[in-house]
Amino acid sequence: MTIMRKKHPLLKLINNSFIDLPTPSNISSWWNFGSLLGICLAIQILTGLFLAMHYTSDTTTAFSSVAHICRDVNYGWLIRYMHANGASMFFICLFIHVGRGIYYGSFMLLETWNIGIILLLTTMATAFVGYVLPWGXXSFWGATVITNLLSAIPYIGNTLVEWIWGGFSVXKATLTRFFAFHFILPFIITALVLVHLLFLHETGSNNPAGLNSNSDKIPFHPYYTTKDLLGALLLLMVLMILVLFFPHILGXPDNYTPAKPLXTPAHIXPEXYFLFAYAILRSVPNKLGGVLALILSILILATLPILNSSKQHGLIYRPITQTLYWIFITNILVLTWIGGQPAEYPFTTIGQVSSILYFTIIIILMPITNTVENNILKLH
C-alpha cells in the first residue's frame, strides 16, 4: 500500500497533498481554518445540490418551493438550515483565515495570497446571488439595491444594470440567471481552491514563529489530520447547534414574507457577514465613491505585500504593529455593528470614522509602525 500511494498517478497527488506533505512542526490551531473552509465548501455543495433538486427558479413559485422544501421534503428543513447557516460559518472561517494571514505575514506568499483574494471575492459573489434565491422581501430588495450600484459606473452603468437584470427591473429573468450563477460558482471556487493549494505547496506553509521551518518538518498525516479532525468536529458542533436550536438567528425576518416590488422593507441590511462592507459603502455620500470604497475594502488586501517593509515575518515579536492589528479587528467589528443599524445620526458618523480608520490603518499606519520597529530593533 505504501508503494501504491507513492506510485499511483492519482494517489500520488493525494499523498503529496494530505499524507506525506512536509509541514512545519509548530503551526497552531489558527492554521486549522484552511481545512475547515474545505469542509464548509463540501457541506455547501452537497446541501445545495439537494436543495436544487426541489427548488424552482421562477418568481411565482420560488418562495413557496423553499417553504415546500422545509415542510414536505424529508429532512428538507435540515438541509435548508444547514445551507443557510453553513454560509455564515463559511464566512466566519474565511475572515479568521484572512486575519491569520495578516497577523502571521502569510501574505508574503504572493501567489497563494492573491488567489485567496480572488477566492474571497468569488465566495462573496456566490453568497450574494444565493441570498436572492428564496425570493423573500430582503432577497428582492437586496438584489435591487446591490445590482443598482453598477449604475454608478460612468457611461455604461444603466445599460449594464438592465443587462444583468434581463429587463427593466429585478424579475423572473434575474432570478433564473442568479440561480444559474449560484449553481456554477461553487465549482469555480473548488477549482480556485486547488490552485490555491498548488501555490501553497510550492513554497510550503508559513508558521507562527515566522522563521524558515525546513530544518524541522513533520508529515501531515497523522499529526495534522488528527488536529484538523478535532477542528472539524468543533465546527460541526457549532453549526449543528445553530441549525437545530437557533436556525433563524442570523437571518432577516423580512425574508419570511414573499417579495413585494411595491412595498420596501423598513431597513435593507445584508447578511451578517457583509455588514462591514455595507457600512463602508454607506459611509460615502457619493454613489460611485461608495461603490469604489466597497470594492477597495477587499482589494486593499492585495497591497499588504507591497506596503510591508518589516524585516520580521509576522507580528508575533512586534508589539506596536500587534496593537494596531487588534485596533483594526475591533474597527471591523464596529463596522459590522454599524452596517446593521439604520442610516441616521450617530451611526452614519461612527461609520464614516470607522471606514476612514479601516483604510488609514492598512495604507498609512501599518507601514509607519513597520519602519519604527525596524529602527527600534536596528534592522536596517
Swiss-Prot record:
It is a multi-pass membrane protein. It is found in: Mitochondrion inner membrane. Keywords: Electron transport, Heme, Iron, Membrane, Metal-binding, Mitochondrion, Mitochondrion inner membrane, Respiratory chain, Transmembrane, Transmembrane helix, Transport, Ubiquinone. One of its GO terms (cellular component) is mitochondrial inner membrane. Heme 1 (or BL or b562) is low-potential and absorbs at about 562 nm, and heme 2 (or BH or b566) is high-potential and absorbs at about 566 nm. Component of the ubiquinol-cytochrome c reductase complex (complex III or cytochrome b-c1 complex) that is part of the mitochondrial respiratory chain. The b-c1 complex mediates electron transfer from ubiquinol to cytochrome c. Contributes to the generation of a proton gradient across the mitochondrial membrane that is then used for ATP synthesis. This is Cytochrome b. The lineage of its organism: Eukaryota, Metazoa, Chordata, Craniata, Vertebrata.
